[in-house]
């Protein structure tokens, strides 16, 4: 609600807003100027629920990715989103950039993990599709507009993410070949 109030005040006063997450993105999209309001989401760091039945985790957008990974692991579940900046990157930023990560070939991009979103539109309106449903054909899939939008359409404030059973075993392999296509073929066989 506070994000909504701040965004509405800025909208009413034609004030530019830059959203800050973990500041791990290196493309300069969070660079701010003296005439802009910087809205940090770092205190929106609550994990609301890890649901073992629906295999989902519901959280605020400022939660550090590694905290989500660990909370899932405590319930013997896997949040497959995992990349180098996991100890400081916030989940809202990962969603806003549609981050890939180390397990993208098996589990897909962040887009494939997001089941529901709550977001604040530029005029301060809160929209919510915080659903845990795997199959939902109840109209437009609003969350898809926000995933990868880099905050241009609104501020993501809460999320429902899909989890997987924690793998019982882990295999590592090394393949050396002169042909990149052979590497791809091998990796797809074992994923």
How does the language model describe each region?
Residues 1-44, 59, 79:
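Glycine-rich N-terminal segment of FAD-binding domains in flavoprotein oxidoreductases
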Residues 46-50, 56-189:
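FAD-binding subdomain of flavoenzyme oxidoreductases
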